[in-house]
Amino acid sequence: MALRTLASKNALSFALGGAARPSAASARGVTTVALPDLSYDFGALEPVISGEIMRLHHQKHHATYVVNYNKALEQLDAVVVKGDASAVVQLQGAIKFNGGGHFNHSIFWENLKPISEGGEPPHGKLGWAIDEDFGSFEALVKRMNAEGAALQGSGWVWLALDKEPKKLSVETTANQDPLVTKGASLVPLLGIDVWEHAYYLQYKNVRPDYLNNIWKVMNWKYAGEVYENVLA
């Protein structure tokens, strides 16, 4: 039982930094996750992000990460019961990739708001921190756009809060690596998906256009709340 508990906790912590959202537990005690509902319609972000992209992104891509992550957790539980250490190690990649995909996208949906509501620059404590750490809001946007455009292959660009020095930073992660893989003290405030599935149907191969436009639907209220809660 100790081996099972330790392996499960290590896998979840490694993949998600403790941020998994449980939905249901199996008879063996495996905690799974569920696809989160969106607080807006698929077409609410148009013309910045098309309804077709949002539907495919949420219903197909994110849903697949959820299915595969839950499957990997169930497999992990089974091999831990058997005491198969090599199988536990082999499952870490699937847990990290699919768990990271679920965690990253769950943040991404919260970071977005309908075109009629989003895009206002952050105010309050987060706005002040951005001015202090980057010089201005415009400088932050320029930095994140540059980092996102330069990221080779697929991945994410993040506005992160480092809890230890209480400073903001811009970070990138490859593939579906969650931000916690860059440092245990980093908290994601805002993430932009730069996988092609997030923009290709609309923007083709011009990733910079997608990055320039997505700021029009950013939910800075959410990012500000996370920032203040972490520092409270």
From Swiss-Prot:
Keyword terms, alphabetized: Manganese, Metal-binding, Mitochondrion, Oxidoreductase, Transit peptide
Location in or out of the cell: Mitochondrion matrix
Entry-linked Gene3D superfamilies: Fe,Mn superoxide dismutase (SOD) domain, Iron/manganese superoxide dismutase, C-terminal domain
E.C. code: 1.15.1.1
Pfam families for this protein: Sod_Fe_C, Sod_Fe_N
Superkingdom assignment: Eukaryota
MF terms in GO: manganese ion binding; superoxide dismutase activity
Transit peptide extent on chain: 1-29
Reaction equations catalysed: 2 superoxide + 2 H(+) = H2O2 + O2
Residues that bind Mn(2+): H57, H105, D193, H197
Keyword Nuclease on entry: no
Family, per entry: Belongs to the iron/manganese superoxide dismutase family.
Subunit structure: Homotetramer.
Record protein name field: Superoxide dismutase [Mn] 3.2, mitochondrial
Natural source organism: Zea mays (Maize)
